[in-house]
Amino acid sequence: MGVNEEGYNELTLSNIKDKEQIYLKAQKDYDELVQHNFTQRILNDKDSIVDGIYNERIKKVHTQTIDLAKNVNVGGEYLTNVGLSKDTIVGLSNTLNVGVDNKVRVAKNSHEFVGENKDIEIGANQ
């Protein structure tokens, strides 16, 4: 770092009992290159905040296992684009709540199978 430059990088190691911590600060950019495997295990919680744009690209397979629950909150639009096919399997019930309009577009064939009962309620025009 030059004499007149402000800002700094920091690496701190603390071994104080019950306050053990490794702290890393990059004043500007932080890059990692792992030429083989990268394994991470967190025995408690993980929190991340990204103040800008978050991009992630996975060139092969992405597998995610969640043992309890998953909540996703999106403040604006949400788009899912699948190149080939998409299957959704729900063990018990599935509910879709739409605030205004719901549209389904099928380019060719559509099939619906109901094992027992089907009820349709229309509040106004048919």
Feature names for model-found ranges:
Residues 1-126:
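Structural signature for extended repeat/solenoid scaffolds and their inter-repeat hinge/linker regions
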